[in-house]
Amino acid sequence: MHLEHDRPLGGGGAPAASGGAGPRWQSPPGTPAGPAPTDRALRVGVGGPVGSGKTALVAALCRALAGRIRLGVVTNDIYTTEDADFLRSAGVLDPGRIRAVETGCCPHTAIRDDITANLDAVEDLESDLGRLDLILVESGGDNLTATFSYGLVDRQIFVIDVAGGDKVPRKGGPGVAGSDLLVVNKTDLAPLVGADLAVMARDAAAMRGGRADRPVLFTSLRSDAGASDVADWVLAQLPSPARPQ
């Protein structure tokens, strides 16, 4: 059973007719994030290309935050439950706090165009576990055009990496330009691929309009400590009563 959502979507997004076919919610790229909710868990989407390190980031965030706040995870894969299985086997959370969505379609469809399956998973988590502070929703691997509907998440993290060289940020796209947080991962590979991190920082800032409210963080997730700045950013998004003291 679906819950009511008090976050209207900018740009005229609207729910599909009850019982009708088609997407439940739609939101255009660039729809601004609103204030953090106080009546349910904050939902943070984690998107990015295949292999950029989304699952590694989610795992590191779970390890960093599990003892401090109440959280759950929803993963997306096209045909398998691979990412959820990895998180469970790694022991980053109690297995009951991790749910998997098999989209059977392009990853962006399930996080932007028809978010019903993901909303069901999110709402089932909250129904089964009670009040949570945070739910991380990991997208399946997609390209630079992938964005989440703000009917599904309250904040968006977009993960790219340096393996493709320092040109990736200036290729732009909604994820690079419009996400609430851009993470440039695998910085330890920069010398091996000839990527200039200063160039990536400059180009990423330019693509994001130099806005202080849309930061860029550089990470290497070879150890969980590499996600500490991202964890701090996530905690800062929580409404004040939910933030650990």
From Swiss-Prot:
Indicate whether GTP-binding appears among the record's keywords: yes
Q: Which UniProt keywords apply?
A: Chaperone, Cytoplasm, GTP-binding, Nickel insertion, Nucleotide-binding
InterPro entries per the record? CobW/HypB/UreG_nucleotide-bd, P-loop_NTPase, UreG
Q: Which GO terms describe its molecular function?
A: GTP binding; GTPase activity; nickel cation binding
Q: List the subcellular locations.
A: Cytoplasm
Q: Got a GO cellular component term for this one?
A: cytoplasm
Residues recorded as binding GTP, renumbered to this chain, are 48-55
Task: Answer whether the UniProt record assigns the keyword NADP to this protein.
Answer: no
**Chain intervals with Gly residues compositional bias:** 9-22
The ranges of region (Disordered) come to 1-43
Q: Name one GO biological process term.
A: urea catabolic process
According to the record's subunit comment, the protein's assembly and interactions are: Homodimer. UreD, UreF and UreG form a complex that acts as a GTP-hydrolysis-dependent molecular chaperone, activating the urease apoprotein by helping to assemble the nickel containing metallocenter of UreC. The UreE protein probably delivers the nickel.
Q: Which NCBIfam families match?
A: ureG
Q: Which PANTHER family match?
A: UREASE ACCESSORY PROTEIN G
The family annotation for this protein states:
Belongs to the SIMIBI class G3E GTPase family. UreG subfamily.
Instruction: Name the job this protein performs.
Output: Facilitates the functional incorporation of the urease nickel metallocenter. This process requires GTP hydrolysis, probably effectuated by UreG.
Protein name per its UniProtKB record = Urease accessory protein UreG
